[in-house]
């Protein structure tokens, strides 16, 4: 059986954690920022956990993470 391949787009977007969860960056922070408030942009900083409903598909895309 051949080796499973990692989806490279997923490996650039998600980072695996030791407990088996994944972290991801926030969306909506690239452009059209003038209409967003400072508070809104501040809350978009940092990372979030991948939601449990999406964990199965992220694990399938990154089999060795």
UniProtKB/Swiss-Prot annotation:
A Pfam family that the UniProt record links to this protein: Ribosomal_L35p
Keyword terms, alphabetized: Ribonucleoprotein, Ribosomal protein
Domain of life from the UniProt record: Bacteria
Comp. bias intervals (Basic residues): 1-15
One GO MF term attached to the UniProt entry: structural constituent of ribosome
Cellular component terms per the entry's GO annotation: cytosolic large ribosomal subunit
GO biological process, any: translation
InterPro entries in the record: Ribosomal_bL35, Ribosomal_bL35-like, Ribosomal_bL35_CS, Ribosomal_bL35_sf
Chain segments annotated as transmembrane: none
NCBIfam families, per database record: rpmI_bact
Family: Belongs to the bacterial ribosomal protein bL35 family.
Protein name: Large ribosomal subunit protein bL35
Organism: Cupriavidus pinatubonensis (strain JMP 134 / LMG 1197) (Cupriavidus necator (strain JMP 134))
Lineage: Bacteria, Pseudomonadati, Pseudomonadota, Betaproteobacteria, Burkholderiales
């Amino acid at each position: 059986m051949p080796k499973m391949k990692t989806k490279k787009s997923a490996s650039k977007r998600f980072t695996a954690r030791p407990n088996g969860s994944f972290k991801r960056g926030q969306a909506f922070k690239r452009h059209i920022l003038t209409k967003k408030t400072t508070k809104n942009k501040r809350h978009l900083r940092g990372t979030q956990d991948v939601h449990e409903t999406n964990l199965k598909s992220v694990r399938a895309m990154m089999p060795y993470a």
